[in-house]
Design a protein with these regions (language model features):
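A glycine-centered loop/beta-turn motif at secondary-structure junctions
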Residues: 58, 103-104, 196-284, 480-481
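Short alpha-beta junction capping motif
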Residues: 100-149, 246
Length: 617
């Protein structure tokens, strides 16, 4: 039987536990400064317009058409690397311009169509240029017949045999050590998910010589290979380097240089042609959730048929918890771009009390609240944004909206929101705008002198072969990605596959799996990323290597330095031994992320090999 004394002790213990529980909840609520955007507390970094202390150190000469798919990313790459850019109408003019620079500082980029006329003369000029130490990059190849008809061109490209004008591939292998992220096989057999296959599998079959190095190769079936008595070395080449004299030629067999993928390929080619590579990166991985939350019951009838309750409840009770669960293991930070109302056709009034709840959730999860700039198929985004801002102001909060998201159909209206000085009058705190991107839109850039633009780089609900290829390329070039989770698609679903239970499963699997090789890069909110983008766009990196008593030392200088900078260091068998002016971390073999805390830094390298030998130098 329970004594009075024991009963009293139990009641006291229950009381203490209850008080502790309630006090914890109260303290959590009290210290939750949810109406503060912590990412906006850092000062806004201004656009640097002053000239660099010295002229461009590196130069790009492009020979080809401006309507080629690789022309925009080449321009973008040259801008990111602070290189001078020169265009030439023909090979002879291009070589004359490239000859004005030191061979180690110039890159001659070619559209294969530029060699369709006067092929023999162009091939001879290019061969002489490469033998003297020049670096030539064929962004696309001349057509099969042109290569077949010119032995000098075949020798320059390192092609020993032309086997077929077109061959259907069973697999494409991208070997490790070129783009970051390790080796990968893109297979085309019946076991693969058809929706993921978006790489072309038919290419000309060029058999390259022993003086080349392959980075990406296609494979035919074992039967085809066996019947022809071929080995792996005879398989169709896609990306390779050919050495001639003191220089080298890079060749791309296919359309892989079109779009954002070109950025990483170009940096990888520079790395493969030099003793080491050192260049600026952003070091930011973003997850942008567009149109979340919606504070109004949208698409009510259809939504209740599919989910059983309205979109407001669904966002709060289903989507938010599953977003937190999906991002937890990878340490992702959510940037959620709210919409008071997603469509002008939506009749019900917004429940603004939900917004305060979300701000508390975000603060607990280190997430950031952004704002959607306009609505679905909006004819006047200025009017709708003014209405939404008035609703938010009625909450009497001090939260600074520094990140915005605009749908592609509304981008043409973006200028209506901008003041002459480049700021937004409706949202004066705005620092960066996320756009849905496109083949000719830069990964990021200055929208105005006050605001940056950051493009979506990948759809989080899918991961095709080309998505994977672009991801590896952008991580190689920029250490950057901006993953989109589109809630407009979920709320206004047109197909059962757009339902949250379907797309959320894909999102969780994709961001957990495909970003693992890039865990060294930081996860950021969109405003944290904006700060790093501004640092990247303003700065220029120069470096040199020399032998010292401590070992081979890379000396780094950063112009327009702003407290910190992130750099990619890629070596050939060496690794950092010590560093002054910053720290480093390993990304993968021969690839390191440097964090500079001074405008000058020095990295001493060490090698496990007694006699260091770099192939091709």
């Amino acid at each position: 039987m329970l004594s009075k004394r024991n009963l009293a002790m139990m009641l006291i213990m229950f009381g203490v536990v209850l008080v502790l529980f309630l006090s914890t909840a109260v303290m959590k609520e009290y210290f939750n400064d949810y109406d503060v955007n912590h990412a906006a507390l850092e000062d806004r970094i201004s656009r640097e317009k002053s000239e660099f202390a010295t002229g461009p150190r590196q130069h790009v000469v492009y020979v080809g058409a401006q309507d080629a798919g690789f022309y925009p990313p080449i321009l973008e790459w040259a801008g990111y690397r602070k290189m001078s850019f020169y265009e030439a109408a023909d090979v002879e003019t291009g070589i004359a311009q490239a000859d004005a620079y030191e061979k180690a500082d110039a890159y001659l980029l070619l559209d294969g169509d530029a060699l369709e006329q006067d092929t023999q003369q162009a091939a001879e000029l290019l061969t002489a240029y490469v033998r003297e130490g020049g670096t030539v990059i064929f962004c696309s190849l001349p057509d099969y017949q042109t290569i077949q008809g010119c032995d000098t061109l075949r020798q320059l490209l390192g092609i020993q045999k032309l086997r077929a004008e077109s061959v259907e591939l069973l697999e494409i292998w991208l070997y490790e050590g070129f783009l970051l992220g390790g080796e990968v096989c893109y297979a085309f057999d019946e076991l693969q998910i058809p929706e993921r296959i978006d790489m072309g599998r038919e290419i000309p079959w060029y058999d390259i010589s022993a003086r080349t190095k392959s980075y990406m190769v296609g494979y035919v079936t074992a039967r085809e290979k066996g019947d022809a008595g071929l080995s792996n070395e005879d398989m169709p080449a896609i990306l390779w380097r050919s050495n001639t004299g003191n220089g080298c030629v890079f060749a791309v067999n296919g359309d892989y240089m079109e779009g954002e993928a070109a950025l990483g390929l170009l940096d990888a080619m520079v790395y493969e042609s030099r003793e080491y590579a050192l260049y600026a990166v952003v070091n930011a991985q973003n997850l942008s959730v567009a149109g979340f939350p919606t504070l109004t019951s949208e698409n009510e009838e259809a939504f209740r048929q599919v989910y059983g309750f309205d979109s407001q409840q669904f966002c709060r009770d289903v989507i938010w918890p599953s977003l937190v669960a999906a991002t937890e293991s990878g340490g992702w930070k959510i940037s959620a771009f709210l919409s008071v109302k997603q469509s002008n056709a939506t009749a019900p009034e917004a429940n603004m009390d939900f917004f305060t709840e979300y701000l508390k959730y975000y603060n607990e999860e280190s997430a950031e609240a952004g704002i959607a700039l306009g609505r679905k198929e909006d004819t006047d985004i200025r009017r709708s944004l003014t209405e939404e801002k008035a609703k938010l102001d009625s909450m009497d909060l001090t939260y600074a909206f520094t990140g915005g998201y605009i749908r592609s159909e509304n981008e043409e209206q973006l200028s209506r929101l901008l003041k002459p000085d480049g700021s937004m009058d409706i949202l004066p705190d705005m620092r960066t705008v996320v756009t849905e991107g496109g083949s000719e839109q830069a990964v990021f850039s200055w929208l105005t002198d006050q605001i940056t633009r950051q493009s979506i780089t990948v759809d989080g609900y899918q991961h095709t072969y080309m998505d994977n290829f672009r991801l590896k390329s952008l991580q190689t070039a920029l250490g950057y990605s901006n993953v989109q989770a589109d809630m407009y698609r979920v709320v206004w679903l047109e197909d059962r596959k757009d339902a949250w239970e379907c797309v959320s499963e894909e999102l969780a699997a994709n961001i957990d799996t495909h970003w693992k090789p890039f865990a060294a890069f930081d996860k950021t909110t969109i405003t944290e990323s904006d700060r790093r983008v501004r640092i990247f766009l303003n700065e220029r990196i120069t470096s040199s290597i020399s032998d010292t008593e401590a070992g081979r030392q890379i000396t780094v200088q950063v112009e327009n330095f702003n407290n910190e900078a992130w750099l990619m260091l890629r070596t050939h068998g060496e690794k950092p031994k010590s560093m002054e002016g910053g720290t480093w971390k390993r990304i993968e073999e021969d690839a390191y992320l440097l964090h500079l805390t001074s405008d000058t830094a020095a990295v001493v390298l060490q090698s496990d090999l007694e006699n260091y030998y770099y192939e091709g130098m």
